[in-house]
Amino acid sequence: MEEGIKMGTKLTSLFKEGEKYQINTKYKELPIKTNLKLLWIDENMKLLGFSIGACVFKGAFTPGTEVYIKINGKYAYGKVFSCSNELVIEFKEIRKEPEFIRRRTVRVEPDPANPVVVELKVDSYSIKTKAKDISETGVGVILEKDKPESAEVIDIIQKNPNSWFDLYVHLPKHGTAHAKGRVRNLSIEEEGIYIRIGFEAEYSKEDREKVRRYVFERQQEIIKSLKML
């Protein structure tokens, strides 16, 4: 919890009914931002009700979705309680600006029907896997922890945290982009079955342009699909 905000702080000291607030979330890794009017506050249940009627990004706010409401340079973190004619958010705590808002470049999730395939070369190993997300400056991949080859690669990466590895990123309609990748983060997903590895990626000017075009087109696809929900 952010310093300066005491436990038990009343919502009415943070929010004012009738005011508009910037609400941030992400959909398929794409940052979503919208300004909505606060209709009501339920102090006991820690709920905030916003008018969302004609918002074109309504489909991004499904129950359980994490949201960040901007207030006075900080962010009220909460989760969507419900979303129909009103967007109801359950307030949790005050936090600093989230990482997805601070990103220097746009990140997107590839279309599962047209995946981005990443060939990861680590020492003598070569593993092909699908990209979890991608931007001009990085790519996230998923490896199955219990596969022997994946386990070896994960072990090598963990022992060489500052090393650069070859990544061959196969982009739908845009060919292959080669990058030098260095691990930025590693996390366990789905009860330890999978390992997500986030790589910082450095491309040549030509290959970076391939990734840029792919990300832009995928961004437009995501926005179009979201507006149809």
Curated annotation (Swiss-Prot):
Gene3D superfamilies: predicted glycosyltransferase like domains. GO terms for molecular function: cyclic-di-GMP binding. It comes from the Bacteria. Residues 102-217 form the PilZ domain. To A.aeolicus aq_820 and aq_1211. This is Uncharacterized protein aq_1583. It comes from Aquifex aeolicus (strain VF5). The lineage of its organism: Bacteria, Pseudomonadati, Aquificota, Aquificia, Aquificales.
